[in-house]
Amino acid sequence: MEENDPKPGEAAAAVEGQRQPESSPGGGSGGGGGSSPGEADTGRRRALMLPAVLQAPGNHQHPHRITNFFIDNILRPEFGRRKDAGTCCAGAGGGRGGGAGGEGGASGAEGGGGAGGSEQLLGSGSREPRQNPPCAPGAGGPLPAAGSDSPGDGEGGSKTLSLHGGAKKGGDPGGPLDGSLKARGLGGGDLSVSSDSDSSQAGANLGAQPMLWPAWVYCTRYSDRPSSGPRSRKPKKKNPNKEDKRPRTAFTAEQLQRLKAEFQTNRYLTEQRRQSLAQELSLNESQIKIWFQNKRAKIKKATGNKNTLAVHLMAQGLYNHSTTAKEGKSDSE
């Protein structure tokens, strides 16, 4: 295909883009279709706008170091900023432009040609290791245009990521793109070696750290977690005095006489009458209420007679409690 052959102007733009500082705010989007003076001036202005720390000689990337995984690139403040703006727009432009280079989509979004944008993408690939996988679905056009950097790749859209794989072989064979390449079925011999080494390293780590618990352990009930300790601690949590929730009230003779007289007058106290009794006898309302409940339950248990409402409900089949304890609860206020 004629579109896959890199143009001389685009190759020169890619070489110059690699010489410029790689961490400009619009780095992945300014690759033009040729080496025009206006675009070169734009690149120089962007280089002048960068801090002096980012322009140190150690931060410049050389063409043979395109491995998509360098620590000096990760430590830059601009790392990962152009993931959505630069590379995804370039990939979308490649998908819209097809084999012609995607000049319509990428130039409209970022101001550069599709093929030139792919050249710049290759130059900035060592800066952002997570940029390349989002552009793989729509990289049918522009990415093969820069395929001359990776030997043995001329099949187009089916192996677009092998371009970055070939560039990665010269540097770091165990980069972060191994997972994405294996997911797309592009893993080669070196990728299988790295996967074996990764699995063996993972097994060694698991052997060296036997105290690591799986995630499901922390998602189960509290009794199944290791942090809850042995299960023999459970009986200790129980309160031995669970039955003695309320202390028994020791009424005086005067209080008992007054309560019995009030009970003879009316077995059921109103709230107002209960409050007045509590103030007169220096008792709590709950103590007076419970005494009246207990007194009614004792009388009912001794006589065995049910109140008229209970008899009426039992005749209709709506009330048939067998024990007197439950019947005593029905009389409670």
Swiss-Prot record:
Give the record's GO CC terms.
chromatin; fibrillar center; nucleolus; nucleoplasm; nucleus
Classification via SMART domains: HOX (SM00389)
The record, for InterPro entries, names: Engrailed_Homeobox_TFs, HD, HD_engrailed, HD_metazoa, Homeobox-engrailed_C-terminal, Homeobox-engrailed_CS, Homeobox_CS, Homeodomain-like_sf
Q: Where is the composition biased (Gly residues)?
A: 25-36, 95-117
Entry's Gene Ontology molecular function annotations: DNA-binding transcription activator activity, RNA polymerase II-specific; DNA-binding transcription factor activity, RNA polymerase II-specific; RNA polymerase II cis-regulatory region sequence-specific DNA binding; RNA polymerase II-specific DNA-binding transcription factor binding; sequence-specific double-stranded DNA binding; transcription corepressor activity
Location(s) in or outside the cell = Nucleus
What segments bear the compositional bias annotation Low complexity?
142-151, 191-200
DNA-binding region, residues: 244-303
Which GO terms fall under biological process for this protein?
A: central nervous system neuron differentiation; dopaminergic neuron differentiation; embryonic brain development; hindbrain development; midbrain development; negative regulation of neuron apoptotic process; negative regulation of transcription by RNA polymerase II; neuron development
Question: Which PROSITE patterns does the record associate with it?
Answer: ENGRAILED (PS00033), HOMEOBOX_1 (PS00027), HOMEOBOX_2 (PS50071)
User: What keywords is this UniProt entry annotated with?
Assistant: Autism, Autism spectrum disorder, Developmental protein, DNA-binding, Homeobox, Nucleus
State the residue spans of region: Disordered: 1-49, 95-206, 223-250
Q: Name one Pfam family in it.
A: Engrail_1_C_sig
Q: Which family does it belong to?
A: Belongs to the engrailed homeobox family.
Record disease entry: Genetic variations in EN2 may be associated with susceptibility to autism.
Protein name as it appears in the record: Homeobox protein engrailed-2
